[in-house]
């Protein structure tokens, strides 16, 4: 067990919730917790109670450790932040209205995501963040829809201004799906793609129940499943939600059935998994019925 990892403040024990003493397996399939006996498989002398979190078929695969270990998460970039503030200030209501109409999401949802306008590239601006307001990148969405990032950007999350400190949060792929879920009145955070951002999602939503919203395509679903596995250790609770078969993603679902239907489905998931209602913050709903 020399490769088992000690828990810490950003990766607490999933059994007792404490940040010290407990050990977690390299593939996060089991925990040794000296505090909680209930639910354990057996007692390991001198270490604690063994709790099996999931049965894995990956036991023959050696865990890969890149040289230099796990890379540090990107820090706040004030140079990009200065540019973002300027672009947000330069974005008048007509640009917000135009993008709202293009995406069929509410204007309020775009304001919650701090959308700006970069005149030099004729692009809408979406800040990408970590927790605590750290800006680490900027995504540009030109009039032609071909998205790219400002030079020097790192992949971050699309985080609305009204994200609560706890409660149910819906995590989706991309800025437009994030705006769609906000339009439905849900607390939502967006990843830049389906296969990135796991660590900063876990950092941001450690005290939340998380519903990972998967796209219908195979790549999107696989990325969502990987995030679910990661958040089993790093969040208060996690489950996954898919749009109905005829819709490719959350925004497509909103366009097909309207915000009330999406909200009702989201409420049903939260009630079935955690027995609690979806608590939205500032209502961003409007349009897209």
Language model features with spans:
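TOPRIM metal-binding catalytic domain and adjacent DNA-binding surface shared by DnaG-type primases
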Residues: 1-22, 28, 34, 45-132, ...
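Acidic beta-strand-to-loop metal/phosphate-binding motif
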Residues: 171, 208-219, 242
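Short, acidic/turn-prone active-site loops that include or flank metal/cofactor-
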Residues: 192-197, 215-218, 243-245
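Short, surface-exposed amphipathic charged segments that create phosphate/polyanion-binding patches used
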Residues: 203-208, 249-262
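Short, aromatic/basic amphipathic alpha-helical patches
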Residues: 222-233
């Amino acid at each position: 067990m020399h490769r088992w990892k000690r828990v810490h403040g950003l990766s607490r024990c999933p059994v007792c919730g404490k940040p010290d003493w407990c050990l977690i397996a390299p593939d996060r399939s089991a925990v040794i917790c000296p505090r909680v006996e209930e639910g354990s498989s057996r007692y390991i002398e001198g270490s604690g109670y063994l709790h099996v979190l999931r049965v894995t078929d990956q036991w023959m695969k050696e865990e890969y450790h890149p040289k230099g270990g796990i890379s540090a998460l990107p820090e706040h970039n004030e140079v990009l932040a200065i540019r973002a503030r300027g672009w947000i200030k330069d974005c008048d209501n007509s640009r917000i209205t135009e993008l709202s109409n293009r995406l069929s999401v509410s204007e309020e949802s775009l304001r919650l995501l701090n959308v700006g306008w970069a005149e030099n590239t004729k692009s809408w601006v979406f800040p990408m963040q970590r927790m605590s307001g750290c800006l680490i990148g900027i995504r540009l969405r030109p009039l032609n829809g071909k998205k790219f990032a400002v030079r020097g950007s790192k992949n971050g999350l699309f985080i609305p201004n009204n994200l609560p400190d706890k409660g149910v949060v819906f995590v989706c792929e991309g800025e437009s799906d994030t705006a769609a879920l906000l339009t439905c009145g849900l607390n939502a955070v967006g990843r830049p793609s389906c296969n990135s951002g796991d660590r900063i999602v876990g950092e941001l939503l450690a005290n939340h129940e998380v519903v990972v919203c998967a796209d219908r395509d195979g790549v999107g679903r696989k990325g969502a499943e990987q995030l679910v596995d990661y958040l089993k250790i790093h969040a208060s609770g996690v489950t996954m939600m898919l749009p109905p078969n005829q819709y490719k993603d959350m925004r497509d679902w909103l366009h097909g059935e309207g915000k009330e239907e999406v909200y009702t489905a989201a409420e049903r998931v939260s009630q079935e998994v955690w027995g609690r209602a979806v608590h939205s913050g500032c209502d961003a709903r409007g349009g897209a019925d």
